[in-house]
Design a protein with these regions (language model features):
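Divalent cation-coordinating acidic motifs and surrounding scaffolds
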Residues: 1-353
Length: 353
């Protein structure tokens, strides 16, 4: 449960505090309607969220209340993959302080160079539900004989975790964007390369957990999840096909059904995705998935007059510039999430012959 030190009830109750309080209450109510209630050991609420330039202070620093809103959203999940964390971890550490002592994170190093954009990948998770199982690394493509392999612009990050009975290797990625045909080709190639790399790794790993009879011990088998911001244009585009065609990765029906309008603010692009590898493992989707559009409740267009004086931008302060400024407060992406079942006790017992 997030902690809001700046709203201490012992301090003077200003108009600004009332404004923040009312929106936090509304946000809590709407999250409770949209996101299933968290369980102790039955389900895992998994999300991916590109939090725009967290935190570059490009349009001025994020407001204290913004951190409260971000923390409130994250706290309704058990595990969140976050893209666009900056080299300076101050913003992430501040967020963790608001989330509370039961939350932890693991973060990658930045990818050097212009294309890397000084970004990190992070996994933020509730330690009451999820534990790190000691493997973390970055995806580096093997060299092909006679050719130079172009590496990822922003190196995908793979980490192993366990939640109840569910063991998973999860990779978060932020695909190259680029411009024109060349940019889209590199983007498509990156998506396909990441998926195929993980497919090959999974096959290799499965061979290592066979018993003396050559049978796979599925209880030692980790599921593979690939998620993040792939800059996918739409579901008919090659960028989408690169994730699933010939890679053994699939996007659950629940995610496809509830992600009909996209995950960008305009709801017309399918940049963010959550994909799972088809294999002999324990992976069972719950009945819920979705995209949470927080702009229906906070930083709304009706709030422009309130925030106008706080906007640190060049040029005129109008509704158009406000809608851009607010994406540097919250994000230009919306969180995409899925519910997974993680209690396999009955399956385990039924396997005992």
């Amino acid at each position: 449960m997030p902690y809001y030190p700046g709203l201490n009830y012992n301090q003077n109750l200003t108009d600004e505090k009332i404004f923040i309080r009312d929106r936090l209450v509304l946000l809590k109510q709407e999250l409770a309607k949209s996101i299933p209630q968290k369980t102790v050991d039955k389900t895992l609420l998994l999300a991916t969220w590109n939090i725009r330039e967290f935190d570059s202070e490009k349009f001025g620093p994020r407001l204290e209340s913004t951190y409260y809103y971000i923390a409130e959203i994250i706290s309704h999940f058990d595990f969140v993959a976050v893209q666009e964390v900056r080299d300076d971890l101050s913003a992430l550490k501040k967020l963790m302080g608001i989330l509370g002592h039961s939350w932890s994170y693991i973060v990658s190093d930045i990818t050097e160079g212009k294309a890397g954009n000084g970004e990190r990948m992070a996994f933020v998770y509730d330690t009451r539900k999820v534990r790190f199982t000691n493997m973390a690394g970055e995806l580096v493509l093997p060299e092909k004989k006679g050719t130079k392999t172009l590496q990822f612009a922003r190196t995908p990050y793979i980490v192993s975790f366990q939640s109840s009975w569910f063991k998973f290797n999860i990779t978060t990625a932020h695909a190259y964007y680029g411009k024109g045909a060349i940019g889209i080709k590199r983007r498509t190639d990156e998506i396909r390369a990441a998926a195929l790399f993980l497919k090959a790794r999974s096959i290799r790993e499965t061979k290592m957990i066979k018993d003396k009879k050559g049978l796979i011990n599925k209880w030692d088998n980790y599921s593979y999840i690939l998620l993040g911001d792939f800059n996918i244009i739409d579901r008919e585009d090659e960028t989408f096909k690169a994730l699933t065609k010939g890679t053994n990765f699939f996007i659950p029906e629940g995610v496809l059904k509830h992600n009909l309008e996209g995950t960008n603010v305009k709801r017309d692009k399918f940049y963010d995705q959550i994909a799972f590898l088809k294999k002999e493992d324990l992976l069972e989707q719950g009945s819920n998935a979705g995209v949470f559009d927080f702009y229906d409740f906070i930083f709304t267009e009706n709030d422009f007059s309130h925030y106008k004086k706080m906007m640190k931008i060049k040029g005129e302060k109008n509704l158009k510039s406000y809608t851009e400024w607010r994406t540097y407060q919250m994000s230009d992406h919306l969180p995409l999430w899925v519910e997974l079942k993680i209690d396999f006790a009955k399956k385990y017992l039924s396997d005992i012959k």
